[in-house]
Amino acid sequence: MAAADGDDSLYPIAVLIDELRNEDVQLRLNSIKKLSTIALALGVERTRSELLPFLTDTIYDEDEVLLALAEQLGTFTTLVGGPEYVHCLLPPLESLATVEETVVRDKAVESLRAISHEHSPSDLEAHFVPLVKRLAGGDWFTSRTSACGLFSVCYPRVSSAVKAELRQYFRNLCSDDTPMVRRAAASKLGEFAKVLELDNVKSEIIPMFSNLASDEQDSVRLLAVEACVNIAQLLPQEDLEALVMPTLRQAAEDKSWRVRYMVADKFTELQKAVGPEITKTDLVPAFQNLMKDCEAEVRAAASHKVKEFCENLSADCRENVIMTQILPCIKELVSDANQHVKSALASVIMGLSPILGKDNTIEHLLPLFLAQLKDECPEVRLNIISNLDCVNEVIGIRQLSQSLLPAIVELAEDAKWRVRLAIIEYMPLLAGQLGVEFFDEKLNSLCMAWLVDHVYAIREAATSNLKKLVEKFGKEWAHATIIPKVLAMSGDPNYLHRMTTLFCINVLSEVCGQDITTKHMLPTVLRMAGDPVANVRFNVAKSLQKIGPILDNSTLQSEVKPILEKLTQDQDVDVKYFAQEALTVLSLA
């Protein structure tokens, strides 16, 4: 920076002020991003006495600039002289925490939380707590909202008198007139509870929690559900029934589906927090109701949690609860009218197999899996197929294979290319589970069909799929079943299919090794150097470059080099370029 020039040490601040006042927002943004450089040049004293006051006074800019400023100030502790001066950063951050734009306020709060840890206890009480109080008592809801996120970081390190004040301020925010503030308080209630003493959690947090959980606004009530998880973790088991469960029961039956959705979404966390006894008496019936909820979003959220909820049930009653109380609800969800619900269930239902064991899986789950494999919604079928490994470990896949096949074939030919892509990605896994005979008989032709799909992404995925299959089944299998079919495509009238032969050879050569590549695949590549389409010819050059390292030197010299040299004389500029590149890379030039 120019400050290094000695006498003209005012230069950087002058530039900054100029650029900060420039009409071009990009220049202002750049100067804010260079703030640490400028602070370094000014030194800690002038940063404190000139730069920070200047920044505090000029907070009236574009949100983008303010966001950058809020972020920078969070890392400024050393630039103002270390922890004993860190309180100098509070005024500009306090201003930023009151602006209208939420993103800027959130970033300012994040920076304030970060620097709070660098305050000594006495500085917290002298500087940080007054800031929290000012924000919490501010006229605008924006400042009161920001205050909510600052209580938990300063509470643990202040005196008990100040702690009492902070609790009172937080209580006021929980009953603020503005829903936005109550929302912010509800969202921070859990983390504030974590730093409170247990007696205060019982005497003060619980009443706040109960009030927020019965707020008139559903957006506040649903945030109280999140806090419920944290609060339940803090309380001893014997207090849960009286202090938390009434509120949780009420939330699980709330008139707003968004609150019930939040209960379903947090269900397994709640389950862990309240423990096995309350789970058995309260949460199992609540879970049944959520799975039967009239709102599809809620049923889908509950469906997502089925496997985890069942896993977490205590071992002594797990099987009984699942078979008598959960499974009947699952059976209804399998034929739900909403495809998101069915898809959510299909993504986890296979996970019940290991929990219930072989006999129950065959008798009770298998019929459900088979029904889902025939579902009209591709996502449902796909989710079942992609989770087959759970079932395979318990009952072996043979039980499913007869129904699997039609489902796989339909997905493999689905009109949506993303569905086709997803099934290709599961093919190596399926192949490994079904075994080579089944694969050759039933699935091989599908894998070949994908190589000539009209969507490039499918052809590309199908090519790497071949490589994974060879890794599973071995190169002898590749030589006998895959390579002849791949090489046959080199004579296809469609040049895209001829190019696919080259792409396949590129990946197959890696797994098949020198012998098979030299004897069986190389001759086809060399022959294709005479293809009428330039795109094919330059891909021949690229293929030779790719497989060259696998071949031995005499083959490279006697067979590959002459062909590449011939291609360097091609009339097409791309063919020449790639042929020359291949010669250079293979050190044949």
From Swiss-Prot:
GO molecular function, one term: protein antigen binding
One biological process term in Gene Ontology: chromosome segregation
InterPro entries from the UniProt entry: ARM-like, ARM-type_fold, HEAT, HEAT_type_2, PP2A/SF3B1-like_HEAT, PP2A_Regulatory_Subunit_A
Cystine crosslinks: none
Cross-referenced SUPFAM superfamilies: ARM repeat
Subcellular location: Cytoplasm; Nucleus; Chromosome; Chromosome, Centromere
Short name of one Pfam family: HEAT
HEAT repeats: 8-46, 47-84, 85-123, 124-161, 162-200, 201-239, 240-278, 279-321, 322-360, 361-399, 400-438, 439-477, 478-516, 517-555, 556-589
Transmembrane segments: none
Keywords: Acetylation, Cell membrane, Cell projection, Centromere, Chromosome, Chromosome partition, Cytoplasm, Membrane, Nucleus, Repeat
Modified residues annotated as N-acetylalanine in this record: 2
Modification N6-acetyllysine, positions: 280
Gene Ontology cellular-component annotations: chromatin; chromosome, centromeric region; cytosol; dendrite; FAR/SIN/STRIPAK complex; glutamatergic synapse; INTAC complex; lateral plasma membrane
Free-text function comment from the UniProt entry: The PR65 subunit of protein phosphatase 2A serves as a scaffolding molecule to coordinate the assembly of the catalytic subunit and a variable regulatory B subunit. Upon interaction with GNA12 promotes dephosphorylation of microtubule associated protein TAU/MAPT. Required for proper chromosome segregation and for centromeric localization of SGO1 in mitosis. Together with RACK1 adapter, mediates dephosphorylation of AKT1 at 'Ser-473', preventing AKT1 activation and AKT-mTOR signaling pathway. Dephosphorylation of AKT1 is essential for regulatory T-cells (Treg) homeostasis and stability.
Written domain comment of the UniProt record: Each HEAT repeat appears to consist of two alpha helices joined by a hydrophilic region, the intrarepeat loop. The repeat units may be arranged laterally to form a rod-like structure.
Family statement drawn from the similarity comment of this UniProt entry: Belongs to the phosphatase 2A regulatory subunit A family.
Subunit: PP2A consists of a common heterodimeric core enzyme, composed of PPP2CA a 36 kDa catalytic subunit (subunit C) and PPP2R1A a 65 kDa constant regulatory subunit (PR65 or subunit A), that associates with a variety of regulatory subunits. Proteins that associate with the core dimer include three families of regulatory subunits B (the R2/B/PR55/B55, R3/B''/PR72/PR130/PR59 and R5/B'/B56 families), the 48 kDa variable regulatory subunit, viral proteins, and cell signaling molecules. Found in a complex with at least ARL2, PPP2CB, PPP2R1A, PPP2R2A, PPP2R5E and TBCD.
Protein name in UniProt: Serine/threonine-protein phosphatase 2A 65 kDa regulatory subunit A alpha isoform
Organism this protein belongs to: Mus musculus
